[in-house]
A protein has these predicted regions:
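Short, structured motif recognition centered on aromatic/hydrophobic residues
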Residues: 2-6, 30, 49-53
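Conserved hydrophobic/aromatic positions in well-ordered beta-strands
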Residues: 6-8, 87
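Generic "edge-of-domain/loop-turn" microfeature
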Residues: 15, 60, 93-94
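An amphipathic, aromatic/His-enriched active-site/gating alpha helix that lines ligand/cofactor pockets
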Residues: 20-38, 54-90
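Short, solvent-exposed loop/turn elements at beta->coil junctions and helix N-caps
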Residues: 40-42
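Short acidic/glycine-enriched loop/turn segments that link adjacent beta-strands
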Residues: 44-47
Length: 98
């Protein structure tokens, strides 16, 4: 299982339309290919959108990333996102901080 924390800087004035696109297109399309959205948050003062996703393997992610369904909305994502940061993280460490 692979877990990613993704931080997007969204172009000014586009955060609300990004959230709509995310909820209406990205989440359901991701789920169809086994890419689960674990959570999502907005940092409005910084125009940031932070989300966490998990997927079984790099191969499963590639299926999603090369799908026609994803390609159909990718032009819209590019117009919203100014900067992308992606971090692969380990699962199951919560008990270590209790």
């Amino acid at each position: 299982m692979v877990t990613q924390v993704r931080v997007y800087t969204i172009n000014r004035g586009m955060l609300d339309s990004w959230i709509t696109l995310f909820n209406e297109k990205i989440v359901p399309t991701s789920a169809k290919f086994g890419v689960e959205v674990v959570g999502a948050w907005a940092n409005r003062p910084q125009n940031e959108f932070i989300w966490v996703r998990t997927f079984e393997s790099e191969e499963k992610l590639k299926e999603y990333e090369t799908s026609a369904e994803r390609a159909a909305y990718m032009g819209q994502t590019g117009s919203h996102i100014a900067k992308t940061e992606v971090r692969n993280v380990e699962n199951g460490l919560l008990s270590a901080v209790r």
